[in-house]
A protein has these predicted regions:
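Long, low-complexity, intrinsically disordered N-terminal extensions of eukaryotic proteins, enriched
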Residues: 1-2, 30-34, 101
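N-terminal hydrophobic or amphipathic segments with adjacent small-residue motifs
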Residues: 16-20, 71, 161
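Divalent metal-coordination and catalytic microenvironments
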Residues: 65, 75, 106, 133, ...
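N-terminal Sec-pathway targeting helices
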Residues: 2-19
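Active-site metal-binding motif and surrounding structural segment of the metallo-beta-lactamase
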Residues: 68-70, 80-135, 139
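Conserved beta-strand hairpin/beta-sheet module of binuclear metal-dependent hydrolase folds
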Residues: 39-97
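Hydrophobic alpha-helical membrane-insertion segments, chiefly the h-region
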Residues: 18-30
Length: 201
């Protein structure tokens, strides 16, 4: 009788260990071997949200949203040279070259560097036709360095103005929240999909 208990216990333990090893192997394969490159994508019906890898070793934010036929870019990453990778990723989904909405959440480098661009890597404003640009209302960023050179923020402002001169409509988040000057707090971006602009300053 004691032998049966030992055999049953050993069988249960063996099954449990096999299960744990199987889960660990599957996790390892997905995480380190078969994981798709380019960032994470979440898709539901006509809405897909892509958290993009930026093509460099720096952290930064850049989110692409596809809502029906509407293309939305939120922030443009950590370095100006990340626009090559970011634009190539977006081009897979944005086939007409038009970003209906571009949003810059705040003026820190890890959010606006791709909008500023560089000599070797054009701004996201140059790479796509931008229809509506929504930006932060306040910043403590300076236009010049102590030595008098333009800052990244100054380059961003120049690129933003060029996009507006090329036909983009520009609103601040505060204008959107207050429904001022043609701005809206809520934009219908696709059938049944709305984008609400929040203002938290």
């Amino acid at each position: 009788m004691a032998k049966k208990k030992f055999s049953a216990g050993l069988t249960v333990l063996s099954c449990f260990l096999a299960l744990v090893i199987g889960f660990a192997a599957a996790f390892f394969l997905y995480t380190y071997i078969k994981r798709p490159t380019g960032g994470d994508a979440y898709i539901s019906g006509d809405l897909s949200i892509h958290f993009m890898e930026l093509g460099n070793n720096y952290t930064g934010d850049s989110i692409y949203i596809k809502a029906g036929d509407t293309d939305i870019l939120i922030d443009a990453g950590s370095r100006a040279d990340s626009t090559d990778t970011t634009a190539a990723y977006i081009d897979q989904y944005c086939t007409d070259g038009v970003l209906e909405y571009v949003i810059a959440t705040h003026a820190d480098q890890d959010h606006i560097a791709g909008f500023a661009g560089s000599n070797s890597s054009p701004s996201m404003f140059d790479r796509f036709t931008c229809e509506t640009i929504i930006t932060f209302n306040l910043t403590n960023q300076k236009m010049e360095t102590a030595s008098g050179n333009p800052t990244l923020y100054a380059k961003y402002v120049d690129q933003l103005q060029e996009a507006v001169d090329a036909g983009a409509t520009h609103y601040t988040a505060l204008q959107c929240c207050n429904n001022e000057d043609g701005a809206q707090r809520v934009f219908e971006v696709s059938d049944g999909i709305e984008m609400e602009i929040l203002y938290n300053y």
